[in-house]
């Protein structure tokens, strides 16, 4: 596990995602509310490929739906497949609405260089569900079957983070589904003895983001292990 001190991520890490907060702010993924400088690439049907304005890595993209619709991945495994094969060398990921998405009211994915995520190569130290798909339809079907097998509240998507990366042949895509047991750890906060850490896909793939210098300097291996144990399921 690596740590990154990134104060620009404080907005995302500390985002309020309750209904009142979402209603009170304009959606920053809708085209009408984005800066004019944030131009879009339309290579993926139904989506806009955008440079993330608060990047974790030097190459970090957000892939936002053209429509303002809730963050949900059921029925969209084919989209993830096309994104992964359309961006070789990148890991495309999805943060569920209670699993790190700072815009749970607008469906979006993100993409970062796969080589920056240590656990993709070394393996994940907590429970994951993995499968490989060789076409978009299979990806959608297998992802939907996986989601249907997970526990969740009636009418709501299971709590998950999902990563997808194409293999060297750029045909087979590896999907890693991370079931979540909690949105944030018990230590989440800015008070004494607390840490402003809210794990999402990048954190759980081996690069934990710390917006505060205090957390970067004081988090121990045991602290990180406990944070992961509280938000993920054990092997």
Q: Model-flagged regions — what are they?
A:
Residues 101-104:
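Short glycine-biased active-site loop of nucleotidyltransferases that positions the nucleotide triphosphate
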């Amino acid at each position: 596990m690596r740590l990154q001190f990134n104060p620009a991520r404080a907005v995302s890490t500390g985002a309020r995602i309750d209904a009142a907060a979402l209603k009170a702010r304009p959606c920053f993924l809708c085209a009408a509310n984005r800066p004019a400088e944030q131009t879009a690439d339309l290579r993926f049907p139904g989506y806009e490929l955008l440079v993330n304005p608060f990047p974790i890595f030097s190459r970090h993209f957000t892939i936002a739906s053209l429509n303002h619709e809730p963050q949900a991945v059921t029925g969209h495994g084919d989209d993830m497949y096309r994104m992964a094969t359309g961006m070789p060398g990148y890991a495309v990921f999805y943060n569920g609405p209670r699993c790190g998405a700072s815009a749970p009211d607008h469906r979006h994915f993100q993409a970062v260089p796969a080589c920056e995520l240590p656990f993709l190569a070394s393996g994940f130290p907590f429970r994951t569900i993995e499968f490989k798909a060789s076409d978009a339809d299979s990806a959608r079907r297998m992802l939907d079957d996986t989601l249907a097998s997970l526990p969740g509240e009636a009418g709501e998507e299971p709590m998950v983070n999902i990563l997808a990366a194409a293999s060297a042949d750029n045909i087979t895509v590896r999907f890693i589904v991370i079931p979540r047991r909690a949105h944030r750890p018990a230590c989440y906060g800015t008070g004494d003895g607390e840490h402003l850490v809210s794990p999402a896909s990048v954190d759980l793939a081996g690069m934990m983001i710390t917006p505060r210098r205090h957390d970067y300097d004081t988090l121990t291996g045991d602290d990180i292990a406990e944070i992961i144990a509280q938000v993920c399921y054990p092997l």
